[in-house]
Amino acid sequence: MPDITLTTLQSLKLKGEKITMLTCYDATFAHASCQAGIEVLLVGDSLGMVLQGNDSTLPVTTDELAYHTASVKRGNDGAFIIADLPFMGYATLEQTFQNAGKLMQAGAHMIKVEGAVWLAESIRLLAERGVPVCAHMGLTPQSVNLLGGYKVQGRNEAQARQMRADAIALEQAGAAMILLECVPSELAAEITQAVKVPVIGIGAGSATDGQVLVLHDMLGLSITGRVPKFVKNFMTGQASIHDALSAYVAEVKGVTFPGAEHGFSA
């Protein structure tokens, strides 16, 4: 696969071609994902749940994410790598710079932070120093205790209006990508149209510029057996993991996934 860059992803948005993203934590799955045509690999703090067995992402550390980012880099064959800054890993500007530097040195092409308009200063300072940033909005798992659980965000008009304004403000601050998790499909479509940067969705309908799922979820692997509404098991009916990954790419590119049943209404 030719090297995917931020310019490539921006071009896909302009052309109206959907972007494919999956979480990835090791070299073997990085290689397999690239072979199937996955364009973006997200080294997510979700590893705390699907690899470590924790009940949230909060225990994950920057050093653990750097370790897995380096592993993904070694198996990567052209995909764009995004790495999460973990819970409290960007509480101060000094922490933000130090931890973002670790992840970029480990092999990330972009770092992802969770939050809203309060992230603007950190995003601006990182962007000015050559670190591309993805702003993760909507349901932000690192804030699960504040949010009162894993709930759809932006369902009332005040929340929706604020989220639209925050997305525009974060783009203006320098965010090069936005990820929307568990927001009403109509709101996600509005935000996607309102900003020029690529918008990736998970539980955000089909109108975003691309889709992401947790690798283990889309392969039907779960410790708890609880499957989010927005997940589809792509192993069903497939002979191999490669076929499942390829089916995901085909359905995202063909805009057959996600279906209406995978999204949320206001």
UniProtKB/Swiss-Prot annotation:
Keyword Lipid biosynthesis: no
Localization, UniProt: Cytoplasm
GO cellular component, as recorded: cytoplasm
Pathway: Cofactor biosynthesis; (R)-pantothenate biosynthesis; (R)-pantoate from 3-methyl-2-oxobutanoate: step 1/2
InterPro entries (UniProt xref): Pantoate_hydroxy_MeTrfase, Pyrv/PenolPyrv_kinase-like_dom, Pyrv_kinase-like_dom_sf
Active site: residue positions: 181 (proton acceptor)
Main location: cytoplasm
Pfam families the UniProt entry points to: Pantoate_transf (PF02548)
Requisite cofactors: Mg(2+)
Domain of life: Bacteria
Catalytic activity, EC: 2.1.2.11
Gene3D superfamilies reported for this sequence: Phosphoenolpyruvate-binding domains
Recorded GO MF terms: 3-methyl-2-oxobutanoate hydroxymethyltransferase activity; magnesium ion binding
GO BP terms: pantothenate biosynthetic process
Residues engaged in binding 3-methyl-2-oxobutanoate: 45-46, 84, 112
Residues that hold Mg(2+) according to the record: 45, 84, 114
Catalytic activity field: 3-methyl-2-oxobutanoate + (6R)-5,10-methylene-5,6,7,8-tetrahydrofolate + H2O = 2-dehydropantoate + (6S)-5,6,7,8-tetrahydrofolate
Membership in a protein family: Belongs to the PanB family.
The protein's name: 3-methyl-2-oxobutanoate hydroxymethyltransferase
Species: Pseudomonas fluorescens (strain SBW25)
Taxon lineage: Bacteria, Pseudomonadati, Pseudomonadota, Gammaproteobacteria, Pseudomonadales
